[in-house]
Each structure stands twice: as C-alpha cells, then as structure tokens.
UniProtKB/Swiss-Prot annotation:
Annotated domain remarks: Contains 2 ubiquitin-conjugating enzyme family-like (UEV-like) regions. These regions lack the critical Cys residues required for ubiquitination but retain the ability to bind ubiquitin.
Gene: babam2
Subunit-level organization: Component of the ARISC complex, at least composed of uimc1/rap80, abraxas1, brcc3/brcc36, babam2 and babam1/nba1. Component of the BRCA1-A complex, at least composed of brca1, bard1, uimc1/rap80, abraxas1, brcc3/brcc36, babam2 and babam1/nba1. In the BRCA1-A complex, interacts directly with abraxas1, brcc3/brcc36 and babam1/nba1. Binds polyubiquitin. Component of the BRISC complex, at least composed of abraxas2, brcc3/brcc36, babam2 and babam1/nba1.
Gene Ontology MF terms in the entry: polyubiquitin modification-dependent protein binding
Disulfide bonds: none
Renumbered residue ranges of the record's region UEV-like 2: 275-364
Family statement drawn from the similarity comment of this UniProt entry: Belongs to the BABAM2 family.
A Gene Ontology term for the protein's cellular component: BRISC complex
Subcellular location: Cytoplasm; Nucleus
Region (UEV-like 1): 30-147
Name of the protein in question: BRISC and BRCA1-A complex member 2
Alphabetical UniProt keywords: Apoptosis, Cell cycle, Cell division, Chromatin regulator, Cytoplasm, DNA damage, DNA repair, Mitosis, Nucleus, Repeat, Ubl conjugation pathway
Biological source species: Xenopus tropicalis (Western clawed frog)
Amino acid sequence: MSPEVTLNRISPALSPFISSVVRNGNVGLDSTSCLRITDLKSGCTSLTPGPSCDRFKLHIPYAGETLKWDIIFNATYPELPPDFIFGEDAEFLPDPSALHNLAEWNPSDPECLLLVVKELVQQYHQYQCSRLSESSRLMFEYQTLQEEPQYGENMEIYAGKKNNWTGEFSARFLLKLPVDFSNIPIYLLKDSNEDPGEDVALLSVSFEDAEATQVFPKLFLSPRIEHALGGSSALHIPAFPSGSCLIDYVPQVCQLLTNKVQYVIQGYHKRREYIAAFLSHFGTGVVEYDAEGFTKLTLLLSWKDFCFLVHIDLPLYFPRDQPTLTFQSVYHFTNSGQLYSQAQKNYPYSPRWDGNEMAKRAKAYFRSFVPQFQEAAFANGKL
C-alpha cells in the first residue's frame, strides 16, 4: 500500500504521526527498507464520518526479518498515546521506564510515534541479545563482536528456536560493515533511484544450529554501491570457515570489500591517466573519448592509405583487467551490413606499466597488427 493511500484512510487527527512513519521511517541498519503499514482498521462506530482508521499493523525490517507489530490508537481521543501488540513476540516485554517518548507523549510532535518505535526496536534488540544465552557459542560470538565498537554499535541479532519440536536453536547476525565508500567516483553512483538512501554494506550471517556447524554468510550492498562495484556478480565473499568465529571472519569480508573499492578508485584514476597519454601520443587521431568515466576511446588511424578505427574499452577494474582493442575497417562491411571488425585482447600488456608506456606499446602493436587486419578485411569483408 502506497503512503498516499495509507494516509487517505487514516483519521485526520492521527495523520501527522503516520505520515512521519511512512515517509521518514528508517529504523535499524537496512536503509533501503522503510517501515510499512498494512491492515488498517477503525475502532470507531460506523456512523463516524470521513476517514476513521486508527489501528494498523506496522512492518519493521530487523536483522533480515520483518517484525509485525499492531499499533492501536483511539481516534476519539487522538491526544492519547497508542497501545502496542508485539505479534509473535509474546515474550518481549519492554521496560516502560526506558520508553521516554511514550511516557512523555507529545501529540503536537509529528515524530512522536516514530521516536517511540525506535525506542521499542532498541529494546527489542536487547531482548534478542539476551536470548543468545541459550547457546554459549552464540553468546561468545555476540560478546566478542560487542567488544569492538565498530561492530558492536552496528549490529542486529535475531535469535530463536528454528524447530519447536526438536528445540533446535538458531540465530542471525546482521552487521553494518565499516567500509568507506566516500571516494568512489561520482559517475558510478549517479545511476540510481531518486532517493537511494545511505551507501551501506550489510553482512548477514545465519547460524542454523547452536554449535555453529552450519553457518551461511551473505553480503547485501545498497543499490548505488552494488552498481559502482560492477553488479551483484562482481563480489563473492568466502564461505564461513569451519571452526572459525565472527570476530575473525567479519574483518576478512571488510578487507575484501575495501580492496574492491580501492580497485574501483584506482581504476578510475588509471583510466584517466591512460586516456591522457593516448591524447598526447595520437593527437588529432583521437575521434572521441569518454570524458566522465574514461571507459572508452576511439582512434582513426591509417597505414599505407588504409584507414581504420581502433575502439578501446577500458574495464572497471583496469589496470588489473586488460583493455579490449577492436579494429574496424572504414571500407569493408560484413554480410549483416556492419563494418568489418576484429576484437583483440592478446597483445603485449602489463598492469604495472604507466599510461605513457601503455600508449607507446599500443602504437607499436597497431603497426604490427594492421597488415594482417587489412588482409582479413579484404578477404572477409565487402566494399
């Protein structure tokens, strides 16, 4: 249900509280998932005019789960705070003395409901952490992470019995990884949603039993970061090693991700250096180039009155990954009507060369390759 539809059904006196929740309702680590409202109902009589819904179910993303709490207002007395029913979490009993925004409910503040929800989620986190005491191994995982502020302050935990018949215990840890994305080139981040939220990496680690014999990690990247690093298939985290623990595994994933970010940043600056060197070496032979991401360059060259184009595609992880050179005749066509071309990746290359050395080596390779390309164009293409 869209925020607009939700607000149109809410009692007008309660609408400011609900608007703040559905429009600004980010709680917890996952900034890409907002609070949602469903199951709108009214406690008013059927004679009450206009929109009168004053109770609903609030969906809260938490540690890879979705908490579903019922919130019950009284539209007849909208100045009163709501009641809460915590659904399947019947054992969750919040400490009223820690719910300051509920005890000091301020109906003139549109954010008062959102503030109470945040306080409740904090207490819910403490409740879940306390449940880990059923497993000494999982409690060890929690305590060692908690001792490191960079992890302990950015962690959500969901624990419980996976199987009520066997009593088997399981838990999921969700951690916001302390990785700096601020230096990723802007052009890689612009193709995103209108409101992409925070750039974040979340690591979910599920323990399917109390002794940690089955552990399944999974990495979640916010949309802009996933796009900047080359898509969902570009980053594979290692399996959780047998006998390992989170305090050893999490830094490994952080380092892996940090290295990927550095490769992308380095690739951007190296591509810019590469294209600058080609502009210097080939001058007026440069037809066009990508002046934003420095990912493409096209040259118009000639050899013994044979003119040809060279399209150079520089990959995201350049210079680790080698550029592709595509030679294209300006005279010859294929049967499908396209200019005859050949792509080459088997040419002298070293990621350790600077841009100037790469340009010099490329020029030498062009001279050595163009005779056979010309011959192939005449043999396989049509004028």
